C-alpha cells in the first residue's frame, strides 16, 4: 500500500517525458545533443513525487507545513551547491523551523519563507537579520533562567526580614487585654523586640557572607587563648602551693603526736608489768630453740 502512489507518479512522469520526445521527433528533427530533458529534471520530479506521497501519511495540520519546507529545501539545493555561506545559513533556518514545529502560533514559525528567500536573494547584505532575532530570544530565556536561580538564593535572606516585620507589627499593635501595662513591662518588650531584630540581622549577614577566617586570624586567636590560659594558671598557682604546705605541716604534726603517744604507752606498760614481760620473752626464746632442734634432720641408724 505504501509504494502504490510513488510508482504511479513515477510511471506518469515517464509517460509525459516519452510523449514530449515523440512530439519533438515528429515535428522537428530529433538530435540527441538538443535534448532539453536532463537527468536532473528526472531526479527533481521524482523528489516532488516522493514529497507528494508523504502528504498522505502526515496529519492534516502538519502536511502542508512539512511539504512546503521540503519543497523549499529541494529548490534551494541546486542554488546552494556553489555557495557554502548560503548553505550554512539555510541549514540554520531549517533547523530553527524544525525546532519550532510544535509552536505554530509563534510569529517566526508562520513567516512566508518563500517570499523571504527571494528577498534574501535580491539583497544578500541583509541575509543575517533572522539570526540575531532568534539569538535574542535564546538570550532572554537564559536571562529568565538565571534570574529564577538568583531569586531562589535570596529567599533564605528574605525570610528573616519578613519575620522581623512581623515582630515589629506585633509589638506595635497592642491587644485590648494588655492595654493597662506598666512602663517597665513595655520597656522589657521593646528590648526583646530589639534583640530579635539583631538576631535576624546576624542571620542575614551569615547567609550572605559566610565566615571565612584567615590564617592570621586563627593564629591570633590561638595566641590569645594560650595567654589567657597562662594568666589563669599563674593566678591559681599560689593557692595549691599554700594548701600543699599546710597539708605537709599537718601530716608532720600528726606523726610526731602518734610517736609520742606510742612511747608513753609502752613505757607505762613496762613499768606496771616488768616481771611478766621478762618471763614472756625468755619463754618465747626457749620455745624457738626447741622447735629448731626438733626440726633438724636426724641421721638414720
Swiss-Prot record:
Renumbered to this chain, the Low complexity biased-composition regions fall at 226-237
Q: Cite the record's Polar residues compositional bias ranges.
A: 170-181
Annotated region (Disordered) at: 167-186, 225-244
Identification of the protein by name: Uncharacterized protein C12orf71 homolog
Amino acid at each position: 500500500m505504501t509504494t502504490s502512489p510513488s510508482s504511479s507518479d513515477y510511471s506518469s512522469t515517464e509517460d509525459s517525458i516519452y510523449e514530449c520526445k515523440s512530439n519533438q521527433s515528429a515535428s522537428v528533427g530529433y538530435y540527441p545533443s538538443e535534448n532539453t530533458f536532463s537527468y536532473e529534471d528526472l531526479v527533481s520530479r521524482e523528489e516532488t513525487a516522493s514529497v507528494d506521497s508523504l502528504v498522505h501519511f502526515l496529519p492534516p495540520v502538519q502536511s502542508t507545513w512539512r511539504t512546503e519546507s521540503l519543497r523549499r529545501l529541494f529548490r534551494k539545493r541546486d542554488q546552494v551547491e556553489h555557495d557554502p555561506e548560503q548553505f550554512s545559513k539555510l541549514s540554520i533556518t531549517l533547523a530553527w523551523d524544525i525546532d519550532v514545529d510544535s509552536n505554530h502560533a509563534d510569529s517566526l514559525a508562520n513567516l512566508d519563507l518563500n517570499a523571504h528567500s527571494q528577498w534574501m536573494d535580491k539583497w544578500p547584505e541583509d541575509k543575517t537579520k533572522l539570526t540575531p532575532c532568534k539569538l535574542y530570544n535564546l538570550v532572554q530565556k537564559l536571562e529568565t533562567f538565571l534570574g529564577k536561580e538568583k531569586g531562589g538564593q535570596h529567599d533564605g535572606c528574605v525570610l528573616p526580614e519578613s519575620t522581623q516585620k512581623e515582630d515589629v507589627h506585633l509589638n506595635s499593635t497592642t491587644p485590648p487585654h494588655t492595654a493597662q501595662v506598666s512602663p517597665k513591662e513595655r520597656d522589657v518588650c521593646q528590648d526583646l523586640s530589639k534583640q530579635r531584630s539583631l538576631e535576624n540581622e546576624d542571620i542575614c549577614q551569615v547567609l550572605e557572607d559566610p565566615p571565612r577566617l584567615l590564617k592570621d586570624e586563627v593564629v591570633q586567636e590561638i595566641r590569645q587563648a594560650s595567654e589567657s590560659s597562662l594568666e589563669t594558671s599563674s593566678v591559681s598557682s599560689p593557692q595549691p602551693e599554700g594548701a600543699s604546705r599546710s597539708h605537709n605541716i599537718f601530716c608532720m604534726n600528726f606523726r610526731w603526736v602518734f610517736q609520742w603517744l606510742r612511747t608513753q604507752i609502752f613505757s607505762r606498760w613496762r613499768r606496771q608489768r616488768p616481771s611478766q614481760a621478762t618471763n614472756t620473752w625468755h619463754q618465747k626464746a626457749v620455745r624457738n630453740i626447741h622447735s629448731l632442734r626438733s626440726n633438724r634432720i636426724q641421721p638414720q641408724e
